[in-house]
Swiss-Prot record:
It catalyses: alpha-D-galactose + ATP = alpha-D-galactose 1-phosphate + ADP + H(+). InterPro entries: Galactokinase, Galactokinase_bac, Galactokinase_CS, GalKase_N, GHMP_kinase_C_dom, GHMP_kinase_C_sf, GHMP_kinase_N_dom, GHMP_knse_ATP-bd_CS. This is Galactokinase. Disulfide bonds: none annotated. The gene is galK. HAMAP family: Galactokinase. GO terms for cellular component: cytosol.
């Protein structure tokens, strides 16, 4: 969607001109899964599937929201003085949360807004539509109210909204990737220290194909919180002998020597995934920097196997996509991405083989699962921004 279309749609809905237009990307994580809430390393990119916005300031204290993705809900009106979570306010709880925490941080938002939203991230796909919306709202508020914010502070407010307003116990990776994204770069982030490096992403003759299971993944209702609790329990058991706060601090030799402290076989498997995935993510960064895409692909495959057997967050749909992808010509690697339990997988595919790949994987998936997957090419882009 371009800026003139955004402005046109805004005027159709609100009857006045927008002040500015905005874009906030989605994200995929190339490798480093379920490590972000375990103090580990991640390697995400911001992508051109994302959330568009148009907005204007109002003279009163009313917030009016409209989403083209939820047209049937019409314009949702919220008083600026009442930024509490209310179930009937549906998707607008995300912007309300961001505004609430911006105010709590001492920023003055002294009048209402009209905000038009259009997103082309498929709902429930696990490509971070909620984080994309959170960062979009932050950028809108920065621009309309002339607020000077460090981007990292905005990223943290997005996470705070997710955790403390919506009630989802997620890590910081999604908001970080979306807020800090850079053209043609992956972000190597240490979630323990929030130190990060931009890693140039030269895929040569290959593209990242996103494969959507089209099985919705409701993060708050999934086993995500259960996995997180298992990891936290494993840490507390290891603390009997080890001075650690997170699994991300462990190398595999140390973990292997002390894993006997963990009293449950499942918790050992969960912790083993995190420790090894952390090492794979560092190796993947080195492979990218060395231009070793074959090595990078092998690490993607190993990541999926670990998520399937040790972390147990894949399921029939994601496994069918990844396993079928591994068998195709021109594929360097494939894995699930995101929280799992549905959502998306990704594959690194030679660009001349993409059509054959989509046909073969799509056909096999439909045979096994009973309905078709969707495919998108992931184009890497910069972080949340003002368009005009």
């Amino acid at each position: 969607m371009n800026t003139s279309q955004l402005r046109e749609k805004f005027k159709e809905v609100f009857g006045v001109e927008a002040d500015h237009t905005f874009f906030s990307p989605g994200r995929i994580n190339l490798i480093g899964e379920h490590t972000d809430y375990n103090g580990g390393n991640v390697l995400p990119v911001a992508i051109t599937l994302g959330t568009y916005g148009a907005a204007r300031k109002r003279d009163d204290k009313v917030l009016r929201f409209f989403s083209a993705n939820f047209e049937e809900k019409g314009i949702i009106e919220v008083p600026l003085e009442n930024l509490r979570f209310e179930k009937e306010h549906n998707w607008t709880n995300y912007p309300k949360g961001v505004l609430h925490f911006l105010q709590e941080a001492g920023h003055t938002i002294d009048s209402g807004m009209d905000i038009y939203i259009y997103g082309n991230i498929p709902n429930g796909s696990g490509l971070s539509s909620s984080s994309s919306l959170e960062l979009l709202i932050g950028v809108i508020v920065e621009k309309l109210y002339d607020i000077k914010l460090e981007r990292l502070d905005l990223v943290k407010i997005g996470k705070q909204t997710e955790n403390d307003f919506i009630g989802v116990n997620s890590g910081i990776m999604d908001q970080f990737a979306i807020g800090m994204g850079a053209d043609q770069c992956a972000i190597y982030l240490d979630t323990n220290t929030l130190k990060y490096d931009l890693v140039p992403l030269d895929l040569k003759d290959n593209v990242v194909v996103i494969m959507n299971t089209n099985k919705r993944r409701e993060l708050a209702d999934s086993k995500y919180n259960e996995r997180r609790a298992e990891c936290e329990t494993a840490v507390s058991e290891l603390q009997e002998k080890l001075d650690i706060q997170t699994l991300g601090e462990l190398d595999f030799l140390t973990f292997d020597a002390y894993s006997y402290l963990i009293k449950d076989e499942n918790r050992i498997k969960r912790a083993r995934h995190v420790v090894l995935e952390n090492q794979r993510t560092l190796q993947a960064r080195k492979a990218l920097e060395a231009g070793d895409l074959e090595g990078f692909g092998r690490l993607m495959n190993a990541s999926h196997v670990s998520l399937e057997y040790d972390y147990e967050v894949t399921g029939l749909e994601l496994d069918t996509l990844a396993h079928t992808a591994w068998e195709q010509e021109g594929v360097l690697g494939a894995r699930m991405t995101g929280a799992g339990f549905g959502g998306c997988a990704i594959a690194l595919v030679n660009k001349d083989k993409v059509e054959d790949f989509k046909k073969a994987v799509g056909q096999r998936y439909e045979e096994v699962v009973g309905y078709a997957p969707s495919f998108y090419i992931a184009e890497v882009t910069g972080g949340s921004r003002v368009l005009d």
